[in-house]
């Protein structure tokens, strides 16, 4: 039985966020989060693709950069989020977008999977004289919108990309129960409470100095 892995994890990251002078008001937390979402959400950084920002966990006292003539303030931010990071030699479920006689293109969220016709598990699949891929267990032709189990052979993404491209191998066809369970698990890895109006009161200035001690390499300078 093929073991499945999820490419999605909940984690904590750091970033540096710029706030305009007109955003320095009682809604500072909301403005910080909105600016953070615009900067890092729905795009890749060196850790993977950030699918969702949950909440800001802590932020430093603002710093006015002398070289910045519009008087914007820079904050060091610690935040919780969900990232997508496919790992080589693991198996995930993808949905076929298109296929032809030379390759299969499938997807899972921000993941775009390319499968060459030579990377098919010959124990589970065969190719007929028309070039169609046949599931040996059901004798049915694989077609667009089918769900497949993909073994990840390699990944490719760069900071700022809006997708992650993977090279994969076609392993098997998952059951309906596995598909439902897999996608439900991906959506419910960990329940994280979304921001409440009182969250800003819980971020005390006593903790803000701790963020400034984090090494610069942990910050997302996109």
What are the residue ranges of the model-derived segments?
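Single-stranded RNA-binding regions, centering on S1/OB-family and related RNA-binding modules
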Residues: 1-222
């Amino acid at each position: 039985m093929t073991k499945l892995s999820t490419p999605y994890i909940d984690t904590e990251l750091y970033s540096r966020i710029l706030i305009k002078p007109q955003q320095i008001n009682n809604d500072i937390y909301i403005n910080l989060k909105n600016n953070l979402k615009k900067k890092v959400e729905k795009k890749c950084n060196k850790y993977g693709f950030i699918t969702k920002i949950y909440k800001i966990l802590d932020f430093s006292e603002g710093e006015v950069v002398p070289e910045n003539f519009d008087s914007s303030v820079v904050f060091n931010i610690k935040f919780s989020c969900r990232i997508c990071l496919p790992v080589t030699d693991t198996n995930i479920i993808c949905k076929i977008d298109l296929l032809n006689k030379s390759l299969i293109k499938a997807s899972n969220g921000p993941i775009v999977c390319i499968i060459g016709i030579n990377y098919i598990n010959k124990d589970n699949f065969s190719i007929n004289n028309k070039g169609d891929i046949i599931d040996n267990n059901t004798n049915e032709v694989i077609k667009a919108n089918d769900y497949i189990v993909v073994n990840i052979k390699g990944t490719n993404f760069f900071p700022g990309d809006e997708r992650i491209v993977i090279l994969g191998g076609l392993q098997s066809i998952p059951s309906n129960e596995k598909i439902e369970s897999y996608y439900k698990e991906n959506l419910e890895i960990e329940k994280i409470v979304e921001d409440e109006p009182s969250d800003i009161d819980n971020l005390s200035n006593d903790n803000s100095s701790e963020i400034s001690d984090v090494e610069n390499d942990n910050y997302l300078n996109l």
